[in-house]
């Protein structure tokens, strides 16, 4: 009788131990995946930038900003005119996105949306200029000659540029250079 109780107790405790280890392993995997998902998926909703989060290899970005190659990007989900977008970015100590190269938006998912960037037509200079006053490099937008003067440029992650009236409401991307 005592041998039977000992064997039964060992069987029950062994089974419960295996179940406990399985649950702990599952919990560990779920926690790892949820933290990885949180740090990879950017929040595209605008809001105050209070908390800092590590999003980039070499720098920290504010909450709701995406870190990529030592720059921080705010990708809006609301639509504004080009000037409203520019003012919002300036209020966040950033500017509308000035593309340095066509690969700059590789981190974005394949979004169908067009976003205002910091490129508009300057009547004074009769040229397309970035918000900081520098000229547009033709290799970025080979078809820029077909853009209509007096417009602003919206861009999507597939590398397409669209010239629209600056009063049209679009989503927008702010860029903050940290280095």
Swiss-Prot record:
Natural killer cells. Residues 68-175 form the C-type lectin domain. Residues 1-10 are cytoplasmic. Its main location: membrane. The keyword Hydrolase does not apply. Keywords: Cell membrane, Disulfide bond, Glycoprotein, Lectin, Membrane, Receptor, Signal-anchor, Transmembrane, Transmembrane helix. Gene3D superfamilies: Mannose-Binding Protein A, subunit A. Disulfide bonds join 58-70, 61-72, 89-174, 152-166. Can form disulfide-bonded heterodimer with NKG2 family members KLRC1 and KLRC2. KLRD1-KLRC1 heterodimer interacts with peptide-bound MHC-E-B2M heterotrimeric complex. KLRD1 plays a prominent role in directly interacting with MHC-E. KLRD1-KLRC1 interacts with much higher affinity with peptide-bound MHC-E-B2M than KLRD1-KLRC2. Interacts with the adapter protein TYROBP/DAP12; this interaction is required for cell surface expression and cell activation. This is Natural killer cells antigen CD94. The lineage of its organism: Eukaryota, Metazoa, Chordata, Craniata, Vertebrata.
């Amino acid at each position: 009788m005592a041998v039977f109780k000992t064997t039964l107790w060992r069987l029950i405790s062994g089974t419960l131990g295996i179940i406990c280890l399985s649950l702990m392993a599952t919990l560990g995997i779920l926690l790892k995946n949820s933290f990885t998902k949180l740090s990879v998926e950017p929040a595209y909703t605008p809001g105050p930038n209070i908390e800092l989060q590590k999003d980039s290899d070499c720098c920290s970005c504010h909450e709701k900003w995406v870190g990529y190659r030592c720059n921080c990007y705010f990708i809006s989900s609301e639509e504004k005119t080009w000037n409203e977008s520019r003012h919002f970015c300036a209020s966040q100590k950033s500017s509308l996105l000035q593309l340095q190269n066509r690969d700059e938006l590789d981190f974005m998912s394949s979004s169908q949306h067009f976003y205002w960037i910091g490129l508009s037509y300057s009547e004074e200079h009769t040229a397309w200029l970035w918000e900081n006053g520098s000229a547009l490099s033709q290799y970025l937008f080979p078809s820029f000659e077909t853009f209509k003067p007096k417009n602003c440029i919206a861009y999507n992650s597939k590398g397409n540029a669209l010239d629209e009236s600056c009063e049209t409401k679009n989503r927008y991307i702010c860029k903050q250079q940290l280095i």
